[in-house]
C-alpha cells in the first residue's frame, strides 16, 4: 500500500533524510543534470531548514516520491531570486501561500517495485492539495520543467502558468500557480478512483 505523509524538517529522522537527499541527487543531478549542490552523494541546499516541510510517498517503507514545502513568508527559491537569470522579473504575491520545490517521482524505484500502473503523480498532487488546505494556505506556487507541466496537465489539476522562462539548457520552465479548490481536488480523486477500479 502506498502511503503519503508530511514531516517537518526538525522531525526528519537521519535515515529518512539520507534516503531523501540521496534520491534527490539521483534525480536532479544524475538524471536531469541540474545545477545543484551535492555532497557525500546527497543533494541538499540552504532551503532544507526548519522552515521546510516534506511530503513523502512510500511503498514498503521505500521513498518513491517527495517534495518540499516552504511558506512564502520565509526565504524560498522563488522569492530569493534563484531563478532570476531564467525569468524576466518574477515576484510572488503577498498572501498566505506555500512554495513547492524539489518534487520528484523515482522512476527506477517505481519500476523495481512494479508500481508503474499506480496513479502516483495524482496521489502526490492530491496530498499537496490536502496539506495546503489543512494548513489554511490560499494556494501553491512552484517552478517546473516542461515535462512536469505535462504530468500536471494529464493529472487533471488545472494549474495556471504565471510566467514562462528559459533554463540554462535553453528549455522552457514555468512559474505556476496551483489552486487547491474543491473542483481540482475532486478531479484528482476521480482519477485515483478510476485507476483503483481498473486495478480491482
Curated annotation (Swiss-Prot):
Its EC number is 2.3.1.184. Disulfide bonds: none annotated. Transmembrane segments: none annotated. It is an enzyme of class 2 (transferase). GO terms for molecular function: N-acyl homoserine lactone synthase activity. The keyword Transcription does not apply. One of its GO terms (biological process) is signal transduction. Gene3D superfamilies: 3.40.630.30. It catalyses: a fatty acyl-[ACP] + S-adenosyl-L-methionine = an N-acyl-L-homoserine lactone + S-methyl-5'-thioadenosine + holo-[ACP] + H(+). It comes from the Bacteria. Keywords: Autoinducer synthesis, Quorum sensing, S-adenosyl-L-methionine, Transferase. It holds the Pfam family Autoind_synth. Required for the synthesis of BHL (N-butanoyl-L-homoserine lactone). Belongs to the autoinducer synthase family. This is Acyl-homoserine-lactone synthase. It comes from Serratia liquefaciens. The gene is swrI.
